[in-house]
């Protein structure tokens, strides 16, 4: 049985990855699961300088999901290279680093800095809805997506993935902009812009007012967008958004995703990624499927 997939030149032992911002740098989850079993770890979003993030509250539970407004809190790219990367190098798992710049120059600076051993891929975050500069402001403009991708590709030999926002009219246009800029793959979707209101105080729950919705509630939207993106580009698509079971993961792959990433479910069930991997294996056995790649893009549409 072959579970190996190739995403933009990066060979993964299986198609199950972690979604950035939901798995930290793997340390905490390493106490619950064997990190070596994962297809890839996508680390928490990094910025050039340390970032405090947004004031609390940062998380708010919703029916079938959650809103978050963390604001990319992190210790910066230098601290990651010095303190976190050595830990990840001890594992036999692909490491993809999510970077979030406020300017095109910042994206290129971090990508160049991360063009080192132990880093297998770069995920360009042009889709975070919880920051005032950069983030989704880039991701809703195809020209910005193209320019950022082009500049990052100039300075790194690593696999370059562009993480797209769902808060656009045509996801295919944005995916094509990333492809035209030289991206090796696209990942989608990031969170959907949402909000919550305290009816007692009549004020927004979040200081930023707008937050990012994730979890099972967004899965049908994510699935539709992955389907559209996979039809719009020739490069691999990594699907995510509300995946909490192997059945969810298979839906994304049948729709055209070469790999999948699990996010919010990690907060609910630390074993979610492993359960999805095992579920896919069982599905393949029951359906006499020898190669996972037979499933990818196998949707039958009349």
From Swiss-Prot:
The active site is at 128 (nucleophile). Keywords: Cytoplasm, Flavoprotein, FMN, NAD, Oxidoreductase, Pyrimidine biosynthesis. One of its GO terms (molecular function) is dihydroorotate dehydrogenase (NAD+) activity. Substrate binds at residues 44, 68-72, 125, 190-191. Its main location: cytoplasm. Pathway: Pyrimidine metabolism; UMP biosynthesis via de novo pathway; orotate from (S)-dihydroorotate (NAD(+) route): step 1/1. It is found in: Cytoplasm. GO terms for biological process: 'de novo' pyrimidine nucleobase biosynthetic process; 'de novo' UMP biosynthetic process. GO terms for cellular component: cytoplasm. InterPro entries: Aldolase_TIM, DHO_dehydrogenase, DHOD_1B, Dihydroorotate_DH_1, Dihydroorotate_DH_1_2, Dihydroorotate_DH_cat, Dihydroorotate_DH_CS, Dihydroorotate_DH_I. Binds 1 FMN per subunit. The keyword Acyltransferase does not apply. FMN binds at residues 20, 44-45, 98, 125, 163, 189, 215, 241-242, 263-264. Its EC number is 1.3.1.14. It catalyses: (S)-dihydroorotate + NAD(+) = orotate + NADH + H(+). Its cofactor is FMN. It holds the Pfam family DHO_dh. Heterotetramer of 2 PyrK and 2 PyrD type B subunits. Catalyzes the conversion of dihydroorotate to orotate with NAD(+) as electron acceptor. Belongs to the dihydroorotate dehydrogenase family. Type 1 subfamily. This is Dihydroorotate dehydrogenase B (NAD(+)), catalytic subunit.
